[in-house]
Amino acid sequence: VLNTGSPITVPVGRVGLTGLTVAEHFRFTQANSEVSALLGRIPSAVGYQPTLATDLGGLQER
């Protein structure tokens, strides 16, 4: 547990794992975009997958 000087202490392991999980979700999304580009499919005008909003919505619900 990390004492930040505030009344709330933050468990160090959870913070690191949360950051790692978020990073992995974004890597997955980026990999989907790269695969679409390699296959010659344009997902959208800005380059993101059409399911990006759904994927990130599922992440936010967790």
Curated annotation (Swiss-Prot):
Its main location: mitochondrion. It comes from the Eukaryota. Transmembrane segments: none annotated. Its EC number is 7.1.2.2. GO terms for molecular function: ATP binding; proton-transporting ATP synthase activity, rotational mechanism. GO terms for biological process: proton motive force-driven mitochondrial ATP synthesis. One of its GO terms (cellular component) is proton-transporting ATP synthase complex. InterPro entries: ATPase_alpha/beta_chains (IPR050053), ATPase_F1/V1/A1_a/bsu_nucl-bd (IPR000194), P-loop_NTPase (IPR027417). F-type ATPases have 2 components, CF(1) - the catalytic core - and CF(0) - the membrane proton channel. CF(1) has five subunits: alpha(3), beta(3), gamma(1), delta(1), epsilon(1). CF(0) has three main subunits: a, b and c. Belongs to the ATPase alpha/beta chains family. This is ATP synthase subunit beta, mitochondrial.
